[in-house]
């Protein structure tokens, strides 16, 4: 499980770097867990260099028995009885006249609980698209109403792999609505906008990364299994969002070091955090190509013969949509996918800290028992 957690975190950071290249100062929000689960289902049917590229990019080559690990991780992350709702769902939509290998269908069912729904892409692709969107909408409590835009599937489509994830968590320490006020949020050194700024003073795990002049705050959700971790520079020091230095330093080792419990102190913190809501949509083909997955998208090169026995399948698009809403009560989020470690240098202990999120920040929602990042985001304009 630890190997898979490290593999997923590495992939998260690498994917984030490709997303910020096309959006240097924009908001970013995605579910790495959803994307890697979806690609793991593709990997199940991939062979040759297609499989090798997927394995290398997703760092599956460092994980023993990858599909069993995903099976255990999914069961652990979405187990019932928790005080939050975290729902994961996988489904395959296949052209009804196409012969998929029974072994492939049995494996996706066993490892990913993904059923095959037979649809008529050939003669009724628009109906199939609507059916897929309707299913995703239901799985994400209506937050992702249209995963697939018109024209994304057509009569040539053979297979659509869908992964949907929905999360709703209540803060362990909720903000009081009466404390929320209008306040300025600095987008960069020059521009500001007015946001709804929430406030509370409670004990939270807090840390400080001195060489980056960056504060770290962990805000647990009820039950403690999931937390939101926020990385906030003390100030905007570059000519952009103020996040450049942190983003350049983001590595698996450093992120683990900065945010692990032993390096955070539980102290009184005055937290000011804006309410924010984001909806993002990505077609990930070019991002994954940049990271080394190339054959998968090419009709002449893709080898998905583990799915069908022949080499006529390829992936035309990987679509990912995500939604997050952070407010006084907690967080609602959904998504669907079609170096040298430096120890924290603590500041002199003070009885309380101020954590005012009035400029761009990074955050992620982590499943603590498995150390897996379920969602990752950058807020430049709440």
Curated annotation (Swiss-Prot):
Residues 352-382 are annotated as: CARD-binding motif (CBM). The record marks 347-348 as: Reactive bond. Its main location: cytoplasm. Gene3D superfamilies: Alpha-1-antitrypsin, domain 1, Antithrombin, subunit I, domain 2. It is found in: Cytoplasm. Expressed in brain with lower expression in lung, spleen and testis. Pfam families: Serpin. GO terms for biological process: negative regulation of interleukin-1 beta production; regulation of protein catabolic process. GO terms for cellular component: cytoplasm; extracellular space. PROSITE patterns: SERPIN (PS00284). SUPFAM superfamilies: Serpins. Coiled coil: none annotated. Belongs to the serpin family. Ov-serpin subfamily. Monomer. Interacts (via C-terminus) with CASP1 and CASP4 (via CARD domain); these interactions regulate the activity of inflammatory caspases. Regulates the activity of the neutrophil proteases. Forms only a stable complex with CTSG/Cathepsin G. During inflammation, limits the activity of inflammatory caspases CASP1 and CASP4 by suppressing their caspase-recruitment domain (CARD) oligomerization and enzymatic activation. This is Leukocyte elastase inhibitor B. The lineage of its organism: Eukaryota, Metazoa, Chordata, Craniata, Vertebrata. The gene is Serpinb1b.
């Amino acid at each position: 499980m630890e190997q898979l957690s490290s593999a997923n975190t590495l992939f998260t950071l690498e994917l984030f770097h490709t997303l910020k290249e096309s959006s240097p100062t924009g908001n970013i929000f995605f579910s790495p867990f959803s994307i890697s689960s979806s690609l793991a289902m593709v990997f199940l049917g991939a062979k040759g260099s297609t499989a090798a590229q997927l394995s290398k990019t997703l760092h599956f080559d460092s994980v023993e028995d990858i599909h069993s690990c995903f099976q255990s991780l999914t069961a652990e992350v979405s187990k019932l009885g928790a005080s939050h709702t975290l729902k994961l769902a996988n489904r395959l939509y296949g052209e009804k006249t196409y012969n998929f290998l029974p072994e492939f269908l049995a494996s996706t069912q066993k490892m990913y609980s993904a059923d095959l729904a037979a649809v008529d892409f050939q003669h009724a692709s628009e109906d199939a698209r609507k059916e897929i969107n309707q299913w995703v909408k239901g799985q994400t409590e209506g937050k992702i109403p249209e995963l697939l835009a018109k024209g994304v599937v057509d009569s040539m489509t053979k297979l659509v792999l869908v992964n949907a994830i929905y999360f709703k968590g209540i803060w362990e320490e909720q903000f009081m609505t009466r404390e929320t006020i209008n306040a300025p949020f600095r987008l960069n050194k020059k521009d500001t906008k007015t946001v709804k700024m929430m406030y509370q003073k409670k004990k939270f795990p807090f840390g400080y990364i001195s060489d980056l002049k960056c504060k770290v705050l962990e805000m647990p959700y009820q039950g403690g299994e999931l937390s939101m971790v926020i990385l906030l520079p003390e100030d905007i020091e570059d000519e952009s969002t103020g996040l450049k230095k942190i983003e350049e330093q983001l590595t698996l080792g450093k992120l683990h070091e900065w945010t692990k419990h032993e390096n955070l102190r539980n102290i009184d913190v005055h937290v000011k955090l804006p309410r924010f809501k984001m909806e993002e949509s990505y077609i990930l083909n070019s991002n994954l190509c940049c990271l080394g997955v190339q054959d998968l998208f090419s009709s002449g090169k893709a080898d998905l013969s583990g799915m069908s026995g022949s080499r006529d399948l390829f992936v035309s698009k990987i679509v990912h949509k995500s939604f997050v809403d952070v407010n006084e009560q907690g967080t609602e989020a959904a998504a669907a996918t079609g170096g040298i470690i430096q120890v924290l240098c603590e500041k002199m202990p003070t009885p309380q800290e101020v954590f005012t999120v009035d400029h761009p920040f990074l955050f992620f929602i982590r499943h603590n028992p498995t150390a897996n990042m379920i969602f990752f985001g950058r807020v430049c304009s709440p």
